[in-house]
Every structure is written in structure tokens, then in C-alpha cells.
């Protein structure tokens, strides 16, 4: 009903910010889950094992900040998987991009080897990392992007 009292700190009422840092590279941090923690989320694990193109598409859309849609990335992943079996090369580039954006270490080994040896585990780990950072990959980039609240409007006739 009443506006909050002003304090000396201009950031006192600011909402916490999640997602990708703006500007330079992120400070170094750790993965929120291990590579083999894919079985912690049974639904995600099943989706990724049976339809990895969906999990990959969702991750790619968030990592590309909406420049690539989930459908486009997922379809390209599926075509590469079906015709060449080398979809892991495509998906490892997104792991590298995500690590650079979030300041994550290249563990347990190089990105391409992680995706070559255990593609479903790598995709689950990336998906779970985005969720831990405040994104909901199901919603896509547009619905995850921060929007300003509507301005207060006066009474109209």
C-alpha cells in the first residue's frame, strides 16, 4: 500500500539477477552437478536417452541467447545423428560456449571427449547447470529473458 522507505543503498530493493553475466568473461566457478549425476532427474535422463535432440535444442537456445531456436538446433542435431553419427562434434561446441559464458572448468576432460564418450550425461549436466543458474530450458530464451515490470498506470476514464 505504501511505497518502501528509501534507504541509503540504491540496490537495496533490487531483485537478484540470474543467468549469464553481461560484459566480460565470467569468474571461474564449478559445475553444480557431476557428469554422472544424470540419474538424479529421472525425467530428464529418460528424455535425453530417448530424444537427445530435444535436450540439446533447449540447451542450445539458451546458450545462444535465442539466436538459434530449440527446433532448429534440435533438428540439425537429429540430422547429424541420423546421417553421420557425429552429432557429438556439434554438441561439444555448445558445451565449450557455455563453459566460456559461465566460467566453468573443462572437466573431467576436454569437451569433445566428454561428448564423444558420454553424450547423454554431458547434455544432462549442461541442462541441469542452466536450471541451477535460474533458467528454465523448457521455456526457451524469450520467456527466460529478464523483462521490466509494467509501469504503474493512473486511473483512467
From Swiss-Prot:
Where it sits in the cell: the answer is:
Membrane
Residues spanning the membrane: 41-57, 66-83
Q: Does the keyword Transmembrane apply?
A: yes
What the entry lists under InterPro entries is as follows: PLAC_motif_containing
Superkingdom of source: Eukaryota
Report, as the record phrases it, the tissue specificity of this protein: Expressed in roots, leaves, stalks, immature ears and silks.
Q: Gene Ontology terms, cellular component aspect?
A: membrane
Keywords for this protein: Membrane, Transmembrane, Transmembrane helix
Mode of membrane association: Multi-pass membrane protein
Report the principal subcellular site. membrane
Report the sequence similarity comment from the record.
Belongs to the cornifelin family.
For this entry, the protein name equals Cell number regulator 10
Record organism? Zea mays
Amino acid at each position: 500500500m505504501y511505497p518502501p522507505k528509501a534507504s541509503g543503498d540504491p540496490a537495496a530493493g533490487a531483485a537478484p539477477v540470474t543467468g549469464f553475466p553481461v560484459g566480460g568473461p565470467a569468474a571461474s566457478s564449478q559445475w553444480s552437478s557431476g557428469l554422472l549425476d544424470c540419474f538424479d532427474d529421472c525425467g530428464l535422463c529418460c528424455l535425453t536417452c530417448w530424444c537427445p535432440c530435444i535436450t540439446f535444442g533447449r540447451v542450445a537456445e539458451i546458450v545462444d541467447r535465442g539466436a538459434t531456436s530449440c527446433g532448429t538446433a534440435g533438428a540439425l542435431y537429429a540430422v547429424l545423428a541420423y546421417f553421420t553419427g557425429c552429432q557429438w562434434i556439434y554438441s561439444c561446441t555448445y558445451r565449450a560456449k557455455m563453459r566460456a559464458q559461465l566460467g566453468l572448468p573443462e572437466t573431467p576432460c576436454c569437451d569433445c571427449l566428454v561428448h564423444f564418450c558420454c553424450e547423454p550425461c554431458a547434455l544432462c549436466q549442461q541442462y541441469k547447470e542452466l536450471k541451477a543458474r535460474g533458467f528454465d530450458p523448457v521455456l526457451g530464451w524469450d520467456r527466460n529473458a529478464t523483462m521490466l515490470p509494467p509501469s504503474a498506470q493512473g486511473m483512467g476514464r
